[in-house]
Amino acid sequence: MKARFALLAAACALLLSSLPVLAHHSFAAEYDGNKQINVTGIVTKVEWMNPHARFYVNVTGADGKVINWNFELGAIPVLLKQGWRKDSLKEGDHVSVVGNIAKDGSHSANARNVTLPDGRRVFGGSSAGDGDTK
């Protein structure tokens, strides 16, 4: 009886410990697949690290107000297969980004495609799809 209880407790602990991992990888939990954003601006910061690379872009709105957008990219191995390199984006680069905005209303998005300063359009490694935009 004690062995069965210990086994059940261990199984429950394992199951519960995996929930944060599942939540982390849920595009639908954080981003709205039906709401795209298409912006152009200046890169202010690049974070090339796992589990997902990120970059930040200052975008000037029609009212002249500058908003700093936070864009999530895919995992580093996925980005490397898509042609990304650690130095593909640098602070000061002028880029265009198509992505899906965060559900929480913040200035965050999952980058689907990024047009780099040299004109190359690269897939952002989004878990939302293959990079095709609507």
Where are these regions (language model features)?
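Short aromatic-glycine-enriched beta-strand elements
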Residues: M49-V59
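Bacterial N-terminal signal peptides that target proteins for export
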Residues: M1-A9
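Conserved hydrophobic positions within beta-strands
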Residues: G41-V43
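Short nucleic-acid-contacting surface segments enriched for D/E, G, S/T with interspersed K/R
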Residues: K81-S96
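OB-fold/S1-family single-stranded nucleic acid-binding modules
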Residues: A102-S126
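Short, structured beta-strand/loop micro-motifs enriched in basic residues and often containing a Trp
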Residues: L73-K81
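Bacterial N-terminal signal peptides
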Residues: A9-P20
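Short boundary/loop segments of OB/S1/cold-shock single-stranded nucleic-acid-binding domains
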Residues: L22-I37
